[in-house]
Amino acid sequence: MGINDNGIYGSLKGNSTTGGIYKMGDHNTGYGEKNNQNNNNKSGGKTIVNGVIVNSNQQKLKGDENEFDHSQDDNADEFNKFPKKVKYNDLLYSVLFAIQMVLFITMTVIAGTKHPNKKEFVEYSLQGLLIIAISIPLILAFFLIWKKIFKIHPTNMIKTSFFSLMITGILFIGLLIGNGWYSWAIVFGITLISLIFFYFAFRDKIPFVGIIISLVLKIIEKYPSTLLVSFVCLIISCVYYNIWLFSVSYNFYYDSYWTAWSYMKFMFLVFNLYWTHYVITYTCYSVVSGLVASWYFFADEDFNGMPPKPCAHSLYRSMTSSFGSIAFGSLLVCLVQMVQFICRGFARVPGLTSLFCNCLQFIALIFTRMLYTFNIYTFSMVSIYGQSFCNSSKKTYNLMVNNNEKLFATHNYMLITMLSVSLSMFLIIGFIVTMIMATIQLENQGWLYVQLVMFLFILYKPFDIIFSSVLTILMCLISDPNAMEVTKPNTFILLSETYDFKSLNP
């Protein structure tokens, strides 16, 4: 069983896919269910579980026989080494993304050569880097403290997160009423009531979510490279955002009035911003999902059996065979958000046009969030099975339709937990960073606010990878719960006490 450049590992002989784990729905993974005696037969120092030979250090997929001689297999390369030729999925969208990035760089360089004052931009960019330098150590320290507490009291931490978010919501609604913003108070009041209803309707899922988050924290502790990947993506994002601001400012520096060409350039820059942002975000998700899926299908409770350098291999797959799929999925979200952006502009025109555009903008906003969330699940499937975006989307849709209640409960508990923790971090660390920057007395306070927005991206990054990791484990459990039963039986028993695996519909 060899790691595949398109998916987590190569397909079995007779059940070939496009380079992924297995054909979903067939469950021909060789894992199989344990019999009444757990099928723990010993043979030559190996444990045989319904045709699956499990060494102390590595799990190997087998067929119905106790041994499988790869030397007699015509497709032995599938099991033992990387394929000689990588299959690039959705290659067209990789090319399109590269073309629009070349256009963006060209526009930026041309604008920069014409602008008389580049020193000002460099000074402001250094201020942003200063905020990043101050923020990251504080965030990592806060995250490590939270991680240690959560590993000890996972269920209580989730409950505490809910109640703290509820209290914050009540205080915020009171603030809105005090300032006379009654319409917004009604909106947030309805949201708060929905949150309370959700908590009491699905509170029986809290122990399961707590166990999953604890498993993810264990993986991150074992492979801190996941955090490194996350912060590298963050740094790339911050550098790109500064360059984008440079390009927007300097492209329109001399424009006393806007022509049709000016509007076209501006729309392209907005399009470039959205598409690049989502590509960076989903690439990070894909890398982390690939590592977590490797842990799910290969490793035991002590991480024995993990392939070498799983994070590096997952990064390689995300930047090669899966990058076209990432660019394709990101483009879809980008296009919907462009519709929202255009409607926001036309909504400023008074009359019926404003009302229509506001309604359309609201619909586009909801659809953007739905598509963004759907893509997170889809890219987990892309990382696991190495298939194209369309094929992965179809499988993701079927899994979500057949298991909507479990996905809904787990997703929202995870999201609200991360939101409440991030909110508390923002209040504490944001106050510290603001005080430090105030004592430095920056010349341009407006630019400070722009950099504080970037600070929000830094704040959420450690929890971003936890969120994507939890969703990946959930997708793996729905796809093939028997895999965990074989590789991690103790964890499977623990999860079975809080989760009805028989009700899953892969």
From Swiss-Prot:
GO terms for biological process: transmembrane transport. Disulfide bonds: none annotated. GO terms for cellular component: membrane. The keyword DNA damage does not apply. It is found in: Membrane. It is a multi-pass membrane protein. It holds the Pfam family Choline_transpo. It comes from the Eukaryota. Coiled coil: none annotated. GO terms for molecular function: transmembrane transporter activity. The chain crosses the membrane at residues 91-111, 126-146, 161-181, 182-202, 226-246, 256-276, 279-299, 323-343, 345-367, 371-393, 416-436, 447-467. InterPro entries: Choline_transptr-like. Glycans are attached at N15, N41. Keywords: Glycoprotein, Membrane, Transmembrane, Transmembrane helix. Belongs to the CTL (choline transporter-like) family. This is CTL-like protein DDB_G0269978.
